[in-house]
Amino acid sequence: MNILHNFVVFEGIDGTGTSTQLRALERHFQARKDMVFTQEPTGGEIGTLIRDVLQKRVIMSSKALGLLFAADRHEHLEGAGGINDCLAEGKIVLCDRYVFSSLVYQGMAVSGSFAYELNKEFPLPEVVFYFDAPIEVCVERITARGLQTELYEYTSFQEKARKGYETIFRKCRHLYPAMKVIEIDAREEIEVVHERILHHLREYRRLK
C-alpha cells in the first residue's frame, strides 16, 4: 500500500473535535506557505453535493453516496492543485477526514466489502491522528451545537461508528506499520489537545 509522505489525516466520530483542531492548527501556522489545510467532503462540486445529501436537501441511496465520496476523494487527490500536487511541491497536507471515514460510515450504511472495494486503491497518509472520546462526551458537544435528530438513535449510531474506527485502526497498525496511528484523548480541553498535536507534529515533521 502506497504511503504519502507529509500527508496527515484527522479522524474520529462526530463531536471529537477534528474540525476544531484543524482550524486551530491553521491559525497557528498561518504564516507558513508550505502547509495546506483541507477536508473531506471537499468544497468542490462533488463535495457540495455530498453535503446536500448529508443535510437531507438531496435524497439518494447509500450506495450512490458512497460512490460520490470516492469520486470526491479521487478529485481531491488527483485534481489540479489537489493533495498530490501539493505534496509534489514539498508541502505538508493536513486533512480533516479521509478514507477511514468512508470505511466506517459507508461500511455501516451498506457493507464493509462495498466500502473496501471503493477505497482500496487510495494511498494512505503518513500519519493519522485518531480522536477518541466516550459517546456521552461527543453527544453532549453535538447537542450543544443543536442536534437535530432523535438522541437514542444518534447515540447508538455513533457507538457503532466508534467501534468501527477502533477495529479499522487496530487492523491498520498490524497491516500497515509504516502508517503512524496516534490516538488522541479528545475528552481533554481544546487547548490541551492542540498542544498534544503540536508536540507530535514537531516530533515527526520538526515543525516550529
UniProtKB/Swiss-Prot annotation:
Q: What is its EC number?
A: 2.7.4.9
Tell me which domain of life the UniProt entry assigns to the organism this sequence originates from: Bacteria
| Coiled-coil segments on the chain, per record | none
UniProtKB keywords = ATP-binding, Kinase, Nucleotide biosynthesis, Nucleotide-binding, Transferase
Reactions that this protein is recorded to catalyse: dTMP + ATP = dTDP + ADP
Is Thylakoid among the key words of this record? no
**PROSITE patterns from the UniProt entry:** THYMIDYLATE_KINASE
The name this protein carries in UniProt is Putative thymidylate kinase
Q: Which organism is it from?
A: Treponema pallidum (strain Nichols)
